[in-house]
Amino acid sequence: MRHSAPGTLRVGMGQMRVDGGRAAVNLARAQQMVLEAGKAQCDVVVLPECLDLGWMHPSARTDAERIPGERTTVLGHAAATAGLWVVAGLTERTDTAVYNSAVLLNPQGELTLLHRKVNELAVARNVYTAGTAIEVSRTSFGTVGLPICADNFEDCHFISDAMADLGANVLLSPCAWAVTSEQDRNQEPYGSLWERSYAILAKRHGVAVVGVSNVGYMDAGAWQGRLCIGASLAVNPAGQVVGRGPYGCEAENLITVDLPLQTRTSRARGADTG
């Protein structure tokens, strides 16, 4: 159900807490964030990367689930109750691999797009297999791509470039942004890497870009001891920052932003995507 004016997308940036390995607790938080976004009249809510088990948590090897599956069903029910689109990062199991995946669910709770992270960091490749496909999905508000976190690194822009070439006019990115416990925010402000990367993509293609990170403590895995700090980010098609989440390990928050969207033409198919 659309709530915003034509040409504008109201996005809920669901900067939720994620506790490593606690799928039931995390899914309950995600459901609540979806319902809050519905009350805030959002068209879509974006949730973090690997929100079920936490990014790089060792439980991924044993507790990842199939997509579609029970976890997408839970989130789908929340989407249908709230009447909005949901983007969520989930840990996916297939017969042969575990993937760091993102899903797009429509307001009826149906799965409409699955993306498997292509640019998985070297430190996480013993947990996740890299994805090999790039797709987009046409929705009631435009055409969506789901790059996951480092898929939007500046040296890997080919991933989101391809999504834009397929007609995407908005990139909705589940993320897990973490820092060491020693990082001094005043000496080393967080976020410039993402601001630059998102602005380049936005201005190159006329796309809006939204990245949503979780908050919380990483209690296991290769980055044990690091802090996920939110600082979620929204950039308009002109490359300007129009939304930002609070910074901090405890900074759980729903941030709403009204994003202008541009009508674009798919280079691959020659079709309007606005």
Model-derived regions: residue spans:
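Hydrophobic residues at beta-strand termini and immediately following loops
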Residues: 14, 63, 115, 137, ...
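A cross-domain feature marking catalytic cores of carbohydrate-active enzymes
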Residues: 49, 90, 148, 175, ...
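Active-site catalytic loop in hydrolytic enzyme cores
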Residues: 93-175, 179-196, 248-274
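CN hydrolase (nitrilase-like) catalytic-core segments centered on the catalytic cysteine
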Residues: 67-87, 153-252
